[in-house]
Amino acid sequence: MAVGKNKGLSKGGKKGGKKKVVDPFSRKDWYDVKAPNMFQTRQIGKTLVNRTQGQRIASDYLKGRVFEVSLADLQKDIDPERSFRKFRLIAEDVQDRNVLCNFHGMDLTTDKYRSMVKKWQTLIEAIVEAKTIDGYLLRVFCIGFTAKDQQSQRKTCYAQQSQVRKIRARMTDIITNEVSGADLKQLVNKLALDSIAKDIEKSCQRIYPLHDVYIRKVKVLKKPRFDVSKLLELHGDGGGKSVEAVVSSEGAVIDRPEGYEPPVQEAV
C-alpha cells in the first residue's frame, strides 16, 4: 500500500476542472493605418496587434504588414475606371497609434484583367525594370490590345510581328522615361491618373491602333535605405506627430519624432 496523500482527492475536485476562459482580444490593441498624402483618404482602416510585453514590442510586429486598397476608396471616387485598380501599401513605421505606410505595388483586379482578353485581337505586353530618382527599383508590367478599324469589314484585327516589336519597344521607352524622370510620389500620382498608359496609347496610334492599354502591375524590387524623416515628409503631418530636435552627448542635433522609444538593449 502506497503511503502518502492522494492529491486528486485532497483537492476535492475532478481532474481537469473548468479553466478560466481568457478573451484573446483583451491582450491586443487597435492601430490606425495611415496612407501617404498623395491619396485623399488618409486613414484606410485599423489593424490589430498584441500589446507590448517585455522583449516583444508591438511595433516590430506591425512593420512589414501589407494592406491592399482599391484606388476608388483611396481617392473617394466612385468612377468605375478607378475601382479595378488595387494599390498595395506597406507599414514602414509606427508613431503612437498610427501605422505609417508607403507605396508597395499596384495591380488590376482579376475580373478586369480577364475581361480584356478576347478573340480576334493581338495582345501586346511589355515588362520594364527602371529606377526612380529617389532610388526605388520597380518592375512595371504594361498591357495593350489591337483595336478594330471602324471602317473595316474584317472580323479580326491582328498586328504583324514587326508592328508588335515596334509597339513593345515604344512601351519600354515611355515607361523607362516616365519612371526614371520622377520620384516615387510623382510616379504614384501618374499611376493613379493612368497618364502613362494614355501616353502609350496615343504614341502607338501611328504604328497600329490600340485600346485597353493599362499599367497592369507594378512591383517594388528594391528600396533605398529607410529614412524616417522622408517617410514623415511623405505623410505631410507625420501621422499626427511632429519632429523634435534632440541634442546628443557629442553636441550634434538629432531629429526624432515625438513619442520616440529607444530600442530594447539585449545587453548592458
Curated annotation (Swiss-Prot):
The text of the family note is: Belongs to the eukaryotic ribosomal protein eS1 family.
Query: Protein name, please?
Result: Small ribosomal subunit protein eS1
Cite the PROSITE patterns for this sequence.
Answer: RIBOSOMAL_S3AE (PS01191)
Task: Quote the cellular component terms of the Gene Ontology held in the record.
Answer: cytosolic small ribosomal subunit
Q: Which GO terms describe its molecular function?
A: structural constituent of ribosome
Region listing for Disordered, in residue ranges: 1-21
Superkingdom classification of source: Eukaryota
Assembly and binders: Component of the small ribosomal subunit. Mature ribosomes consist of a small (40S) and a large (60S) subunit. The 40S subunit contains about 33 different proteins and 1 molecule of RNA (18S). The 60S subunit contains about 49 different proteins and 3 molecules of RNA (28S, 5.8S and 5S).
Sorted UniProt keywords = Cytoplasm, Developmental protein, Differentiation, Oogenesis, Ribonucleoprotein, Ribosomal protein
Q: Which Pfam families match?
A: Ribosomal_S3Ae (PF01015)
**Keyword Cytoplasm recorded:** yes
Q: What does this protein do?
A: Essential for oogenesis; required for late follicle cell development.
Please give the positions of the paired cysteines in each disulfide bond. Answer: none
Subcellular location(s) per record: Cytoplasm
Choose any GO biological process term that the UniProt entry carries and state it: oogenesis
